[in-house]
Design a protein with these regions (language model features):
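Non-catalytic, conserved peripheral segments adjacent to functional cores
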Residues: 1-105, 124-126, 136-148
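Conserved metal-binding segment of the jelly-roll/cupin
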Residues: 102-124
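Hydrophobic heptad-repeat coiled-coil signature
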Residues: 112, 149-152
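Active-site scaffold segments
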Residues: 128-132
Length: 152
């Protein structure tokens, strides 16, 4: 896999090596040892999947405090524009964002560390989106970032 550090520290774009032949393709979607060597010691505890139609905007969600989640996201069907916004107040990139296109064609993955809001917009007729998280969902800590929110 090719690990690409984005312009925001801790946010990674990961490009798997895909092997094609007459039968289709094969790729390793996740290798814990390799992931930790590049990204750090993140222990994923759950995999989630969602299906959405064209034009659906999911997010920008985040969980506060100890309930914060790191995510490793990818698209297995369709195409999305995926966005991570830095909410770490002590970060020099606080309020900045990274956006990437994830699709079944490019097979890229996007790692978003704790302390970020995350969301995506579906660009294809439908998209199946899957992601690993390192913490359980805590509804009492769930927040939604709106485009009109002040960056403070």
């Amino acid at each position: 896999m090719n690990y690409i550090q984005t312009e925001i520290d801790g946010v990674w774009l990961i490009e798997p090596k895909v092997f094609h032949d007459a039968r289709g393709y094969f790729m390793e979607a996740f290798k814990e040892e390799e992931f930790r060597a590049h990204v750090g010691n993140v222990h994923f505890i759950q995999d989630n999947e969602s299906k959405s139609s064209f034009g659906v905007l999911r997010g920008l969600h985040y969980q506060k405090g100890d309930c914060s989640q790191a995510k490793l996201v990818r698209v297995i069907k369709g195409k999305v524009l995926d966005v991570a916004v830095d909410l770490r107040k002590s970060s020099p990139t606080f309020g900045k964002y990274v956006s990437v296109e994830l699709s079944e064609g490019n097979k890229r993955q996007f790692f978003i560390p704790r302390g970020f809001a995350h969301g995506f917009l579906v660009l294809s007729d439908e998209a199946v989106f899957t992601y690993k998280v390192d913490n359980v969902y805590a509804p009492q800590s769930d927040c939604l970032l709106y485009t009109s929110d002040a960056a403070d």
